[in-house]
UniProtKB/Swiss-Prot annotation:
Disulfide bonds: none annotated. It is found in: Membrane. PANTHER family: SMALL INTEGRAL MEMBRANE PROTEIN 19 (PTHR31888:SF1). This is Small integral membrane protein 19.
């Protein structure tokens, strides 16, 4: 072989500078792959914490706007309280001495 283009030297030994460069390059790639895999697993486990860091804080306009589900639950609670008060008023208007009874007849 002529010149320094080949892997083998003049005495038949392997040029170790090429192998050292190859080993360093593969070690760097291996480290990059392992670090990126570790970061991916961390991001997968702590998704909410990471999203909280990058989320924009809410403005005053969105704070004044009520949450839809909170509004629904408050409306439902108000309806239940109104029905309860109506039933209590109805119970107090009925005389207490009359017992509700149902008569069944078999024919």
């Amino acid at each position: 072989m002529a010149g320094g283009y080949g892997v083998m030297g003049d005495d038949g030994s392997i040029d170790y500078t090429v192998h050292e460069a190859w080993n360093e390059a593969t070690n760097v790639y291996l480290i990059v792959i392992l670090v990126s895999f570790g970061l991916f697993m961390y991001a997968k486990r702590n998704k909410r914490r990471i999203m909280r860091i990058f989320s924009v804080p809410p403005t005053e306009e969105t704070l004044s706007e009520p949450n839809f589900y909170d509004t629904i639950s408050k409306i439902r609670l108000r309806q239940q309280l109104e029905m309860y008060s109506i039933s209590r008023k109805y119970d107090y208007q009925q005389p207490q001495n009359q017992a509700d009874s149902v008569q069944l007849s078999l024919e």
